[in-house]
Amino acid sequence: MIVLRKTLAVLAAVFLALAAAGVGAQAPGLPQLNRDYVRLDPPRPVASGDRIEVIEFFYYGCPVCYELEPTLARWLFNGPASVTLRRVPALATDNWDNFAKLFYTLEATGHLARLHWPVYDNFHFDGIKLNEEAVMVNWVSHNGVDKEKFISAYHSPEIQAKLAAARDMTRNYEIKGVPSIVIDGKFVTSARMAGGTRELMQLVDRLVELARKERAK
């Protein structure tokens, strides 16, 4: 059974914190290169057309990624306009493979939107070892996923290809830690650089605007 008892409390706390933070807040200055973000040189290609591409590199086992997720979900729900979000499981080490395979298998079987947050919550809050394949398979089968279809997809060449692509992207985008966010193939920032998860999404908004201005030149 999915344990979601913390979800509403987490989201409510995030919304209240964001609302409180907005009272009396001063307009932030321009993002500072090499302090708030780094610039990829050359810029990496994007496939988002007229939209600004935002890529989140994450790891389900990362507590800061877990903390970020409700804020990121709220940011995605509210805008900004003309932005597309892409999630990529970072693969800095082979120990992260199982969680990346879980992400891509849930995506391939059509259950990612429903189970993305519960993976985080059940792992971090409930201590369910979802990075272990046997535990993972039992968990998904108890949460409405066909067990045999999941296992077949999990071990398929298609998922292995996605892992290889994610590993290449982690290296190509010079990802040093998670969560990291890449804006329009040009700017890379992180919760560490921003000073926190709430500050990270505020910084992303500013970098999206910077990317939009650079596109207009």
State each model region's role.
Residues 142-217:
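C-terminal cap of thioredoxin/glutaredoxin-like
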